[in-house]
């Protein structure tokens, strides 16, 4: 003591002298900072990671490892004397035990205080109590039966017991594996957390000291090890977690390798407990599910179901100051007892409240995992932990960060399921909703500062939350509609065992990723340049590859006769809206994708994917028996096209009806109808196969009339500046144009067919294309509309002439719209006089302006006008989307823009161009950008 006092005095004097020197010489450089104070006999500075104890005599601090005092022993010391002081004042004084039922055993046992959990009296009483058997709720099964498919179908809501290791995928050391082997693989210097059961308090100890305690038959107290995670040790090689835990685990499936956050290691725990070790009721951190396997010994689980009432009671009990004095099993309706013997494996689901008693010395292995089956319960448990102010040591590491990773991945999963036409399972939808709610809560202004730390750098929180909202809303809207069954696919992107068939969804997803990887655009391109390159690429395509996807219909026409080899690569980049071509109508169906065996590419390697799904994806309508017979009687698509072309040129309409469109496509949809009056005509034997109701007329005048009428541009087709003069090859061009719209290109065959066609006749007659092309479903279906309001009339002679000429012009113009005719039209220019053009434009404007009226927000046609209204070769943005146009969707090289550029002819000479359409750059911008009026939103 004298030496210590002298040292203190000397230190004080030195400090005073240094202070005086600094005051007397202010101009000098400041002295270096004093060294940190040192403690203990080792004279080392303070280390927060090492246990230290204070001497009650000299008031100096000593490392427990330097003076031979364990942390769990320190609580039993009443007065501590360091080695120097012990020589003068004697050894340390220990506390005296006065009870066996309280955590503080120094309290006087007057019988007034209740028993606390973990004490010797508590364990003795617990062993003597009777509980309902867990056999009432537990599910026992073989390892091969416990699959992800089973849990997704039946849920993971009750504990599962697997008596044997067979087919479970769990690999463990032999039952002869001891605590000394653990020390050898993990290392004796590793500091571990140890539970002092009698006090229900945590302390730290080296693994070597714990093994020494465990092997000692005379144990002064009960110590339990429940949190030795060994994933980063050599012992990890001896243990493989069950297959089901690995397949379901969020960490295994969603945690990115390049994350700035350290990967949570919670899958491999070694539990070593001596007899009478007890862990009070708890929910595993983050609401994780847990698996336990008893290598040797025995454990008893007390299980409580996580009902809303029980969870509320648990939170109240956990926050109570008398928690240790109340056995939680007495507060609930039922507490089940489950004995896990050597070799048994127990799976405890999310949120189950459980306590564990070690009935005999035991070594067990276990692990925790988050998964998609109970996302809502996991989030509820996490929020409960925050309200209870649970220490970070007992929380799931980076729980919020992994929630962001999972939300981002599940958003992609739901979008792919929707794209593939599958309905996500209810547990996944409910989980995404709960996750979306939690993410929104964390991003509130008053709370974002608390949660910003765990937001990953590669996640845009606001955008992700908005996208989740859209997907959830879309799923809710689709819930009432019939959809394809998804089966039970895996929602985690993991590989299945070889003996378990992979569902169609996995094959599509895998092939999609491979395809996307091959065609990935360099990241240094901006959006405008990307779309500009795509458009320029399309402009160089062959004329017969019609750009059906880019039309203003904002829909997708799936060609029945187009082989998969002719589908351009960019067709996969379409929007989600589909217009399905059925047997008789164009029907908008937003529920499912159209699938056809001929349209499958590399994405459909699975045999299950190649099954036709038209019945599940489309609304079908019965056609007349005559049309079915005609369709069945045509063995080849080419013959059907030839016959439909001949029939198109040989009939005359006498009655016409049209209707306005509705957004919904119902079963009562009716079509545009044209009834035909019968007249005598000549027909060859080959034409009798497709004869409908009217007799045929001679077609030479029809062709000439079509060509003459086509030279006069309709008001709605002004973007075509110049036209080709009539030539001897125009017949071939007209029919070849119609075939190019159908996806076929048989030029030589067409020439032979045209030569064999009878061309003698005098009168013009026109048959409805939707009827005469019964064998060509795609061409016929373009003349149908959804839910029309039907009206009809008997046409007069002048009305018939107007209808025939108007439709002939549109039909001939559409049929001639291919790249070859466009190039010819640029070479052979035919100009009309300005007076004639002005007169025609004014007369057509008067007729068209009086032909339609808006009633109840829908378009209806005046009976005096027979031609359908079209705008620039596409649907007008101001009209309903589903309204039918008598113009096929055109290739980008031939389609006019939504706002056409000014026409540089005499009719428009002197007029200012439209705003935003004066230059080619502005017009290209109109093509690349979204339509601003809200209708037909899509990218080219």
Curated annotation (Swiss-Prot):
PHD-type Zn finger ranges: 37-88
Q: Which keywords annotate this record? A: Chromatin regulator, Dioxygenase, Iron, Metal-binding, Neurogenesis, Nucleus, Oxidoreductase, Phosphoprotein, Transcription, Transcription regulation, Zinc, Zinc-finger
> Which parts pass through the membrane?
none
Quote the record's binding site residues for Fe cation: 282, 284, 354
Protein localization: Nucleus
- The annotated regions of Polar residues compositional bias extend over 613-623
- Recall the GO molecular function terms of this protein's record: histone H3K27me2/H3K27me3 demethylase activity; histone H3K36 demethylase activity; histone H3K9 demethylase activity; histone H3K9me/H3K9me2 demethylase activity; histone H4K20 demethylase activity; iron ion binding; zinc ion binding
Q: What is this protein called?
A: Lysine-specific demethylase 7A
Organism per entry: Mus musculus (Mouse)
């Amino acid at each position: 003591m004298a030496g210590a006092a002298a040292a203190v005095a000397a230190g004080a004097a030195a400090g005073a002298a240094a202070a005086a020197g600094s005051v007397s010489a202010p101009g000098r450089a400041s002295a270096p900072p004093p060294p940190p104070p040192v403690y203990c006999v080792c004279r080392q500075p303070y280390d927060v990671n090492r246990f230290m104890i204070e001497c009650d005599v000299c008031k100096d601090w000593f490392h427990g490892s330097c003076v031979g005092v364990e942390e769990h022993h320190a609580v039993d010391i009443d007065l501590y004397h360091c080695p120097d002081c012990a020589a003068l004042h004697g050894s340390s004084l220990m506390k005296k035990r006065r009870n066996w039922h309280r955590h503080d055993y120094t309290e006087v046992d007057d019988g007034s205080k209740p028993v606390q959990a973990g004490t010797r009296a508590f364990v003795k009483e617990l062993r003597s109590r009777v509980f309902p058997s867990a056999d009432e709720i537990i599910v026992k099964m073989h390892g091969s039966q416990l699959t992800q498919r089973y849990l997704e179908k039946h849920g993971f809501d009750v504990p599962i017991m697997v008596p044997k290791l067979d087919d479970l995928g769990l690999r463990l050391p032999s039952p002869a594996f001891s605590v000394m082997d653990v020390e050898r693989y993990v290392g004796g210097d590793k500091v571990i957390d140890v539970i002092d059961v009698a006090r229900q308090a945590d302390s730290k100890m080296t693994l070597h000291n714990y093994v020494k305690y465990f092997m000692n038959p005379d144990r002064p107290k009960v110590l339990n090890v429940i949190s030795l995670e060994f994933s980063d040790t050599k012992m990890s090689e001896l243990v493989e977690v069950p297959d089901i835990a690995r397949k379901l685990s969020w960490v295994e499936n969603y945690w990115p390798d390049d994350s700035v956050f350290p990967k949570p290691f919670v899958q491999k725990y070694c539990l070593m407990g001596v007899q009478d070790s007890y862990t009070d009721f708890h929910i595993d951190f983050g609401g994780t599910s847990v698996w336990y396997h008893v290598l040797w010994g025995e454990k008893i689980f007390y299980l409580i179901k996580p009902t809303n009432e029980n969870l509320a009671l648990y939170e109240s009990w956990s926050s109570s100051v008398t928690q240790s004095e109340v056995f939680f099993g007495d507060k609930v309706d039922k507490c089940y007892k489950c004995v896990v013997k050597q070799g048994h494996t127990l799976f405890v689901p999310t949120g189950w409240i459980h306590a564990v008693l070690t009935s005999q010395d035991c070594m067990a292995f276990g692990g925790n995992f988050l998964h998609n089956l109970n996302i809502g319960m996991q989030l509820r448990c996490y929020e409960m932990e925050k309200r209870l102010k649970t220490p970070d040591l007992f929380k799931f590491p980076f729980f919020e960060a992994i929630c962001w990773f999972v939300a981002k991945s599940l958003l992609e999963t739901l979008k792919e399921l929707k794209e593939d036409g599958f309905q996500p399972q209810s547990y996944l939808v409910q989980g995404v909703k709960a996750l979306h709610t939690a993410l929104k809560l964390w991003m509130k202004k008053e709370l974002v500062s608390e949660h910003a730390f765990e937001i990953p750098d590669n996640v845009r929180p606001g955008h992700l939350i908005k996208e989740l909202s859209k997907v959830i809303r879309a799923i809710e809207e689709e819930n009432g509609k019939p959809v394809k069954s998804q089966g039970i696919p895996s929602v985690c992107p993991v590989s299945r065992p070889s003996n378990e068939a992979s569902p169609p969804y996995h094959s599509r997803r895998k092939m999609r990723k491979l395809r996307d990887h091959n065609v990935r655009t360099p990241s240094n391109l901006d959006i405008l340049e990307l779309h500009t390159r795509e458009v320029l690429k399309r402009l160089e395509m062959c004329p017969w590859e019609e750009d059906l996807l880019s039309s203003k219909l904002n829909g997708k026409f799936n060609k029945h006769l187009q082989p998969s080899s002719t589908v351009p690569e960019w067709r996969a980049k379409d929007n989600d809206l589909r217009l399905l071509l059925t047997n008789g109508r164009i029907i908008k169906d937003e529920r499912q994708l159209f699938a056809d065996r001929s349209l499958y590419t590399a994405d459909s390697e699975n045999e299950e994917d190649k099954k036709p799904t038209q019945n599940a994806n489309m609304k079908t309508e019965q056609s007349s028996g005559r049309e079915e017979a005609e369709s069945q009687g045509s063995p080849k698509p080419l013959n059907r096209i030839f016959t439909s072309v001949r029939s198109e040129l040989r009939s005359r309409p006498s009655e016409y009806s049209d209707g306005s469109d509705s957004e919904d496509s119902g079963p009562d949809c009716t079509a545009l109808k044209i009834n035909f009056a019968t007249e005598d005509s000549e027909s060859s034997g080959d034409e009798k196969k497709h004869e409908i109701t009217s007799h045929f007329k001679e077609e030479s005048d029809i062709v000439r009339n079509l060509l003459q009428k086509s030279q006069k541009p309709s008001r709605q087709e002004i973007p075509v500046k110049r036209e080709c003069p009539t030539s001897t090859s125009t017949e071939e061009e007209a029919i070849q144009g119609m075939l190019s719209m159908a996806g076929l290109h048989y030029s030589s065959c067409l020439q032979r067919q045209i030569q064999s066609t009878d061309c003698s006749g005098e009168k013009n007659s026109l048959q409805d294309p939707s009827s005469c092309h019964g064998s060509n479903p795609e061409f016929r279906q373009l003349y149908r509309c959804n839910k029309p309001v039907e009206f009809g009339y008997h046409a007069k002679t002048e009305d018939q002439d107007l209808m025939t000429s108007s439709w002939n012009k549109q039909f001939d113009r559409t049929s001639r719209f291919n790249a070859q005719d466009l190039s010819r039209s640029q070479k052979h220019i035919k100009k009309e006089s300005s007076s004639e053009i002005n007169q025609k434009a004014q007369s057509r404007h008067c007729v068209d302006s009086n032909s339609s009226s808006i009633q109840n927000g829908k378009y209806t046609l005046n009976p005096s006008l027979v031609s359908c209204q079209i705008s620039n070769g596409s649907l007008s943005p101001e009209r309903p989307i589903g309204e039918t146009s008598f113009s096929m969707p055109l290739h980008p090289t031939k389609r006019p823009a939504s706002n056409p550029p000014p026409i540089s002819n005499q009719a428009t000479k002197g007029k200012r161009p439209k705003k935003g359409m004066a230059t080619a750059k502005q017009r290209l911008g109109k093509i690349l950008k979204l339509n601003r009026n809200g209708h037909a939103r899509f990218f080219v």
